[in-house]
Amino acid sequence: MSVRVARIGKPHGVRGEVTVELFTDDPQARFAPGSVLSIQHARGGRRGQGSAADAREPLAVQSLTVTGHRWNKDVLVARFEEISDRNAAEAARGLELFAEVADLPLEDDEWHQDDLLGLVAVDLTRGEARIGTVKALIQGSAQDLLEITPQGGGRTVLVPFVEEIVPEVDLDRGLVLVSPPPGLLELGEGE
């Protein structure tokens, strides 16, 4: 299994460097020289029909090997063995980069985003009563949110993914333990 770690942005200069939109918490490790990342075309990326991007030849490779990276203000600029000039950098624009899960070590209290999908959310304030199933993890600037599809159907519930409200994720049992403040789970009811 692989997880998305970044998306290639616009070219930076004429020597094949590209900007990178990050989806990882550890860019130093993911973009270390020698790291190999598999590629996929982004869904709904900038390669819209009729655009100049349509005329670009796609890269004829399935993976990219990192040769280096640097920071330009708060933007990661990366170099890859397979991208040697601005034309190749332009052809790579919009590609999504993936790393194998086995290459992404985790601490004891960490998990990959995809591991959360499909877990059963239970309410600790009601004796582990089933709330529903985790549908998505929505990443936000202030905090992440778990989108939970209620067991009985209806409108999805958004639960702040913070330790005070979600004290534990138990992958072995397939559970997300939720300790909601009064009224949180009722916000989506009645619509």
Curated annotation (Swiss-Prot):
Cellular localization per UniProt: Cytoplasm
InterPro entries attached to this UniProt entry: PRC_barrel-like_sf, PRC_RimM, RimM, RimM_N, RimM_N_sf, Transl_B-barrel_sf
GO CC terms: cytoplasm; ribosome
All copies of domain PRC barrel, residue ranges: 107-184
Keyword Chaperone: yes
Domain of life, source organism: Bacteria
GO biological process: ribosomal small subunit biogenesis; rRNA processing
Pfam families: PRC_RimM, RimM
Keyword Flavoprotein assigned: no
Main subcellular localisation: cytoplasm
GO molecular function: ribosome binding
Cystine crosslinks: none
Keywords: Chaperone, Cytoplasm, Ribosome biogenesis, rRNA processing
Assigned protein family: Belongs to the RimM family.
HAMAP family listed in its UniProt record: Ribosome_mat_RimM
Role noted for this protein: An accessory protein needed during the final step in the assembly of 30S ribosomal subunit, possibly for assembly of the head region. Essential for efficient processing of 16S rRNA. May be needed both before and after RbfA during the maturation of 16S rRNA. It has affinity for free ribosomal 30S subunits but not for 70S ribosomes.
Summary of subunit composition and partner proteins: Binds ribosomal protein uS19.
Domain remarks in the Swiss-Prot or TrEMBL record: The PRC barrel domain binds ribosomal protein uS19.
Protein's UniProt name: Ribosome maturation factor RimM
Species assigned in the record: Kocuria rhizophila (strain ATCC 9341 / DSM 348 / NBRC 103217 / DC2201)
Lineage summary: Bacteria, Bacillati, Actinomycetota, Actinomycetes, Micrococcales
